[in-house]
Amino acid sequence: MHKPILCVLALLCAAPAAAVNVPAELPPAVCNVLETCRMVGKGRLRWWGFHVYDAALWSRDGRWQADAPYVLDIVYARNVTTAQLAETSIDEIRRLGVSDATKLARWDAAMRNTFPDVQPGDRLIGIYRPQRGAQFYSATRLLGTIDDPEFARRFFSIWLDPRTQKPELRAALLGGNGRTD
C-alpha cells in the first residue's frame, strides 16, 4: 500500500531535475526578424508539480533589454486550449495592473484569433517588436500579428516583469541559474 505512494512521490520529486527541453535554434523566419539570435536563458514552468511548458528567451546579442526586440519561445508539455491561453494571459495582465475592461476585451479577442490550441511538443513563439506590437509563430508558420505596442509590452510582462507570479522562471529566462519549479 505504501509502495504506490512512494513511487508517486519519487516521480514528483525527480521531475524538477529534468532538463529544460527547448530547441537549440529558432525557426529561420523568426530569427530573421532579429537578424541574429542568441539565447538569453531558459526555464521550466511547473504548476502544482506538473510540467506545463519549457521556455527560452532570445535576443540579438544574448542579453535582454526591455526596449529592444526579443523572442519568447514556449514548448508546451500539456494540452492547452486557445481559450485557456487567452484567459490566463488576460488574468495575468490584469494582475499586473491593467484594469481597462475595453482594452482587455480587445486583447482577449486578438489572442483568441491568433493563438491555436496547443498539444505536447507544440511551440508558441512570440516576437516583441518595440513601438510596433507582437508577432506569433508556431514551429512552422506565422500565426498572426497584433499591432498594439501596449498589448505587446503587457503580454511579455507576464514572464519578464519583476512582479511576475513565477520569479524563478523569470530569473532563468534572464540567464539566472535558479530553479524554475
Can you name each region flagged by the protein language model?
Residues 13-17:
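N-terminal signal peptide c-region/cleavage motif recognized by signal peptidases
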Residues 19-181:
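Terminal leader/tail segments of proteins
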Residues 1-6:
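Bacterial N-terminal signal peptides that target proteins for export
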